[in-house]
């Protein structure tokens, strides 16, 4: 209620955008002030959930004094644990609200769904992946429908009865109980579907038009191995996940350099789409990458921290 929220000002602090994402950090700064809200009458579970969300991002909860319309009072506030977390750009709540709030809300929702579960610590480690899933969902939900996309509107015709977050690791696994329309305008009963929550990826075939040669990489793949393939080292185009806030074409160029040690001079988009829509949300952006292979020597590349070889 309105009685549980009030405005407050903290002296000798200022709020900046964080370096690591679209969120605020409060930094000591003499003769400045920061505006905020006080939340009163929080329950113990409320505080535990707030601590789970904030403390995992290198914040600390500490007592401090703030000014309100009723005078000075003592509160607990979340402060960043390192001064190097902040950029030099002053925080704007209105900019955050218009540009980032929808993504942050969805990411926080997924993140907090893992509170109190065996995946609680994993969620903090994998938060950028959670952010990326939220970014993709917001982008897809707001994108205009093309002339080639048929079928009823998703939001008005597909009813989600229950969403269960079954697993979180490098990817996530959800179970969705839902109803959806048939082409004869009838509606299905409640169906349970298990879905691998993948991400977006750029797939690039490096090509030298002068030599008329392509470049492939060979690497171990868990899919063939778990299928029983005796030779799970496969030849394939360069591919890699698109990071949060990264453009597909930038990811394509980055991946070619990381996995093959060569620069792309030009990208030609082939198409984009779902490689396996019945099992995963993964979405590929497919490119031809123009390269110069005249002096290229095969070698061992990849990011070792990611287990690439």
Language-model features, listed with the residues they occupy:
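Conserved hydrophobic/aromatic beta-strand scaffold that supports enzyme active sites
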Residues: 38-39, 61-63, 173-175, 216, ...
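Short histidine-centered catalytic/ligand-binding loop motif
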Residues: 32-40, 235-245
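Unchanged
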Residues: 190-191, 200-203, 238-309
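N-terminal strand-loop-strand
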Residues: 194-237
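Short amphipathic beta-strand and strand-loop transition segments with alternating hydrophobic
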Residues: 65, 156-167
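Acidic, metal-coordinating catalytic segment for phosphate/diphosphate chemistry
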Residues: 166-211
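A short, polar/proline- and glycine-enriched secondary-structure boundary/capping micro-motif
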Residues: 48, 58-61, 86-88, 215, ...
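Glycine-aromatic micro-motifs
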Residues: 2-155
